Regions:
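Single conserved hydrophobic/aromatic residue that forms the stacking wall/gate
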Residues: 1-8, 12
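Extracellular beta-rich repeat passengers
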Residues: 6, 21-122, 126-258
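Short active-site-adjacent helix-start/loop capping segments
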Residues: 11-13, 30-31
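A short, structured loop/turn motif at beta-sheet edges
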Residues: 13-18, 77
C-alpha cells in the first residue's frame, strides 16, 4: 500500500511491450490461474488530496494506521503506467473484498494511464475522493463494478473500456458521500468521456449508476447490452443539465451533465 508524498517518485512505470503484471502466485498449470478471481489482494495507493469525510481523512477498509486524504488537490503519488492487475480481490472480511486498483485521496499530480484490471472479485478501479485522472484504462470481467467513485472524487477519466461478464455488476457506480449528507463537500464530480461499456445481451445491471449525491459530466459513451444505460437517483439537491458548456459544467460540482 504505497502512501506517497508531494515529492513522490515513480511508483510503477513500464512500456507497452513489457507491462508490469500483478497476478496470482499459482502455478501456470493450475486450472484457476487464468480465470480465477480473488486469488490475491490488489493495488492500493493512498494520497493527500481532499475527500468528503469528517476530519478530512479516512482508512481504506481492511487497512488501519495508513490514512488517506488531505488538503492538496495537486498531490503527486507518482506514475502508474502500463500496469495490469489480474485475478485479485481476496476477501478480508465477509462481503469486503479488495479492489483491483484503489486510488484513495490521490491527487491530480499523479499519472494513471494504460492500466488494466481483469477478473477481480470486487471493483476494477475505485477512487475514494481525490482528483486523480485516468487515461487509457480498461476493466475486464470483474465481479463487481468496473469504475467506482466515492467520497468526493473530482477527477477525470478518458478513453476507458469496460467489458462485463454475465455476473459483473455495473459499468460505473458513482457516489459522493455514502450513508451521509448527500450535499456534503467536496461533492463527487467525475468527468468521464470517450467510454465504451460492453455487456452480454440484456445484462441486468446498469451501465452507469449515479447516486448518493454525485454530480458529474459524462460524454461520448458507447453502451451495449445493458438493460438501463443510465440510472440516476438519490442525489440530493442536484441540478441536471445538458445546456452548460463543458468548462462550466466541470467547474460546478452540484451539476450532473449527461
Amino acid at each position: 500500500t504505497p502512501r506517497s508524498s508531494s515529492a513522490a517518485s515513480d511508483v510503477y512505470k513500464r512500456q507497452a511491450e513489457a507491462p508490469i503484471t500483478f497476478r496470482s502466485e499459482l502455478d501456470a498449470t493450475d486450472p484457476n490461474y487464468g480465470n480465477g478471481r480473488g486469488l490475491w489482494g490488489g493495488l492500493i495507493i493512498n494520497g493527500y488530496a481532499p475527500i468528503a469525510n469528517d476530519g478530512g481523512t479516512a482508512n481504506v477498509e481492511g487497512l488501519t494506521g495508513v490514512p488517506y486524504g488531505g488538503t492538496d488537490p495537486d498531490d503527486n503519488s507518482g506514475v502508474l503506467r502500463y500496469v495490469r492487475v489480474w485475478n485479485g480481490g481476496s476477501s478480508i472480511a465477509p462481503d469486503n473484498e479488495i479492489n483491483g486498483i484503489t486510488l484513495a485521496g490521490v491527487g491530480r499530480g499523479t499519472t494513471v494511464e494504460y492500466c488494466e484490471v481483469g477478473l477481480n472479485l470486487d471493483d476494477g478501479f475505485e477512487m475514494f475522493g481525490g482528483t486523480v485522472d485516468l487515461k487509457y484504462c480498461s476493466v475486464i470481467a470483474v465481479g463487481d463494478d468496473a469504475f467506482d467513485t466515492d467520497a468526493g472524487y473530482q477527477g477525470r477519466g478518458q478513453f476507458l473500456l469496460v467489458v462485463r461478464a454475465d455476473d459483473s455488476d455495473k459499468g460505473h457506480e458513482m457516489d459522493s458521500k455514502t450513508n451521509g449528507d448527500l450535499d456534503s463537500q467536496p461533492r463527487s464530480h467525475p468527468h468521464f468521456a470517450n467510454v465504451t461499456v460492453i455487456s452480454s445481451v440484456a445484462h441486468g445491471e446498469d451501465a452507469l449508476r449515479l447516486r448518493e449525491g454525485t454530480g458529474g459530466d459524462f460524454r461520448n459513451y458507447i453502451i451495449h447490452g445493458a438493460n438501463d444505460g443510465v440510472r440516476n437517483d438519490d442525489n440530493g439537491s442536484e441540478l441536471v443539465t445538458q445546456d452548460l458548456a463543458a468548462a462550466q459544467a466541470h467547474g460546478q460540482p452540484n451539476y450532473l451533465y449527461i
